Amino acid sequence: MAQHAVYFPDAFLTQMREAMPSTLSFDEFISACQRPLRRSIRINTLKISVADFLALIAPYGWSLTPIPWCHEGFWIERDDEEALPLGSTAEHLSGLFYIQEASSMLPVAALFADDNHPQRVMDMAAAPGSKTTQIAARMGNRGAILANEFSASRVKVLHANISRCGIANTALTHFDGRVFGAALPEMFDAILLDAPCSGEGVVRKDPDALKNWSPESNLDIAATQRELLNSAFHALRPGGTLVYSTCTLNRQENEEVCLWLKETYADAVEFLPLGDLFPDADRALTPEGFLHVFPQIYDCEGFFVARLRKMSSLPAMPAPGYKVGAFPFTPLKGREALHVTQAANAVGLLWDENLHLWQREKEVWLFPAEIESLIGKVRFSRLGIKLAESHNKGYRWQHEATIALACPTHAHAFELSVQEAEEWYRGRDIYPQTPPAADDVLVTFQHQPLGLAKRIGARIKNSYPRELVRDGKLFTGNS
């Protein structure tokens, strides 16, 4: 694999020599940093099993190598990347997989280690959504995830990825993560803090990542990380699990931040060793039980992961100063709820007791039950999934609800051919040789829901959202 020129400040190299254990070669570190990063994907098991996905893509000639810490993760090599980018494949568009760097799958693996089954989880710095969607898959779309993102522009990307992957158990917030310890004290069974960092581990993806690097900026970032970790620890319930991770390599932003928490709260903090997380994990193990992944160890991005347990309750932080405001939704119950449920079921949209119906004017939403105790304590950017808009003739079912809830074996399901699916993704109506009998059609491809549509005579009217419409080649092996 070709080398590429990476910019290394001298002070960074000095720091890495000091941080790297004697068992590792510094020359191999430099060599690994100069190799382009291997691409990797994570199969979305909310949509398809690993075995079924591998069978589906077998004819494509993709070379997949298992990632040892993530059963559904694979390094991928393809010959047709220029003709058809991985992100434009039909399997990606329908949410069957997520393009995710291998080492970034480690934090969620750590969060769910030792048969941990949290019901309410916070992803404190969630965009673009790789870890949120990985958490949702591990939870089987049950329970609830509060996915927070400080950057307003990245909240939109986060929602788009959650929607594409068919996730229904998530609430989105847009806050500085430092508010949660005070706003939601001891409310979460598990928290992932993938902290903002200096990004020293990403030079294989971005050779200029260290252009603005300095030891002083690392210390400033570490101060922010301590504040975020303190907030996360207060928001965690006693007995809960917290994973702290970064994509950087210096000790100040990694081990020292975690040791600061231990020094501050002493017996309330228990470090949970990660040496048994996967075969060969001990190659990256620190004396504290953390994983400090230098890029040459597993041929991936540099990364750091620590897991800890909260052993006892803490005194409350000062109450937050913001006002939440009136909640604009009301629960939908009784006859109205039954009517909506029956109408949705009739077109193939199904859900269980984990999701509850709420209403705002003519909008009908589904919220995860586990999130309801947080209502009134924090403002949500988006909560659950929008199911429908009501009108005089019934309901206008929403695309994100179809992707998350539709049953592809429903009587109204209509499986498209490859050519018809290409037309669908391009926003065009479908003219099947044998039109479906029903007026309301659940359009599927590869037995995955693509949308709900109306049959008008012999034509299926396209309902694919305009902002998602694609042009160009979409299907592997199809010219």
UniProtKB/Swiss-Prot annotation:
This is Ribosomal RNA small subunit methyltransferase F. InterPro entries: Methyltr_RsmF_N (IPR031341), MeTrfase_RsmB-F_NOP2_cat (IPR049560), MeTrfase_RsmB-F_NOP2_dom (IPR001678), Nol1_Nop2_Fmu_2 (IPR027391), Nop2p (IPR011023), RCMT (IPR023267), rRNA_ssu_MeTfrase_F (IPR023545), RsmB/NOL1/NOP2-like_CS (IPR018314). S-adenosyl-L-methionine binds at A125, A126, A127, P128, G129, S130, K131, E149, D176, D194. Keywords: Cytoplasm, Methyltransferase, RNA-binding, rRNA processing, S-adenosyl-L-methionine, Transferase. Its EC number is 2.1.1.178. GO terms for biological process: rRNA base methylation. The active site is at C247. It is an enzyme of class 2 (transferase). Its main location: cytoplasm. Belongs to the class I-like SAM-binding methyltransferase superfamily. RsmB/NOP family. It catalyses: cytidine(1407) in 16S rRNA + S-adenosyl-L-methionine = 5-methylcytidine(1407) in 16S rRNA + S-adenosyl-L-homocysteine + H(+). One of its GO terms (molecular function) is RNA binding. The keyword Methyltransferase applies. The gene is rsmF. One of its GO terms (cellular component) is cytoplasm.
